[in-house]
Amino acid sequence: MGRVYATSDWHSCDFYKEVLNQLNEDDTLYFIGDAIDRGPAGIWTFNALWADKRVIMLKGNHEDMLAQYLTSEERLQGYVDVNGGDVTMQSMSGMMHEEKEWYIRTINKLPEEIVYHSPKGHNVILEHAGYSPFDMPHRSHDALWDRTHFSDEWNNGFSRDGLDPKTTYLVHGHTPVHYLKFIYGFKDKPTWTMADFREKEEFFNDDLEKMTIKPEIICYCGGHKFDIDMCTVITDRIALLDLDTFEEIYFDRENLKK
């Protein structure tokens, strides 16, 4: 029996083949969103993940934006102008209408959440952005975009039918671990809002020295939440988290491309 991993936010990196080649044939990889945009590989990173039978894909906010943009360019011009969708659209420029329709259908069918039941007896909720256990059920928008749940106390207010909070964990991406380490600090404020995040994000993004530090997975919220977003487009690093043992595995572009 192979190993079961989670990863996220590859953002059109150009070393996706090398990472997939590290997996064994009987491994399973949950990709929890944002295969596309910003990086040089365009749509091809998404295509490779989708075609790999070992990979189970979840929707990220960037996939959701792509599907909306392909449906109506006027609805979401910011996808291209602000969110790195220009690279993805360039890689799709020669595609027929039917091919683009396939992406819309495929993305819209991707799950926003999966619960992995480990044979070791614990459960792992997989979701792109993560969420607060106080907010169940939560909106689809939050599953893809939320950045307000980082100060939660896991065992207080947990509300998921059939899941014991003591043996349940949440793995998410969407927010680069740099942000949690340098912006939130986990101690600055008792609660966070998106306005708080935007206020500090503007200053943080100008500090490229912090952004290029090789990141590692952050485990927080009393050991029950894991952020696995390595900001790959800047750091050239991808993280895999073993969902049974919680072992962390890292792949760096400079090592794989030798």
Q: Can you annotate each of these PLM segments?
A:
Residues 162-258:
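Acidic, His/Gly-rich catalytic cores of divalent-metal-dependent hydrolytic chemistry
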